């Protein structure tokens, strides 16, 4: 059976090398996030200040996979 993942929303606080980011979740936890392969293939740019959805394992809540970048409400995209 497949492991259940918890999906949270958060804010990118710092960019690290190799597609890694520090993400502050809405519940104030700090998680080390890496970019999923689909986002990497689509050349989606993630910058500090962006809101993202992150998938966190229930066994290791200190790291997770960034699966979606949420659109900013004030941008013209």
Swiss-Prot record:
Its main location: plastid. Coiled coil: none annotated. InterPro entries: NA-bd_OB-fold, RNA-binding_domain_S1_IF1, S1_domain, TIF_IF1. One of its GO terms (cellular component) is cytosol. PROSITE patterns: S1_IF1_TYPE. The keyword Secreted does not apply. It comes from the Eukaryota. GO terms for molecular function: ribosome binding; rRNA binding; translation initiation factor activity. Residues 1-71 form the S1-like domain. CDD domains: S1_IF1. It is found in: Plastid, Chloroplast. Keywords: Chloroplast, Initiation factor, Plastid, Protein biosynthesis, RNA-binding, rRNA-binding. The keyword RNA-binding applies. One of the essential components for the initiation of protein synthesis. Stabilizes the binding of IF-2 and IF-3 on the 30S subunit to which N-formylmethionyl-tRNA(fMet) subsequently binds. Helps modulate mRNA selection, yielding the 30S pre-initiation complex (PIC). Upon addition of the 50S ribosomal subunit IF-1, IF-2 and IF-3 are released leaving the mature 70S translation initiation complex. Belongs to the IF-1 family. Component of the 30S ribosomal translation pre-initiation complex which assembles on the 30S ribosome in the order IF-2 and IF-3, IF-1 and N-formylmethionyl-tRNA(fMet); mRNA recruitment can occur at any time during PIC assembly. This is Translation initiation factor IF-1, chloroplastic. It comes from Nuphar advena. The lineage of its organism: Eukaryota, Viridiplantae, Streptophyta, Embryophyta, Tracheophyta.
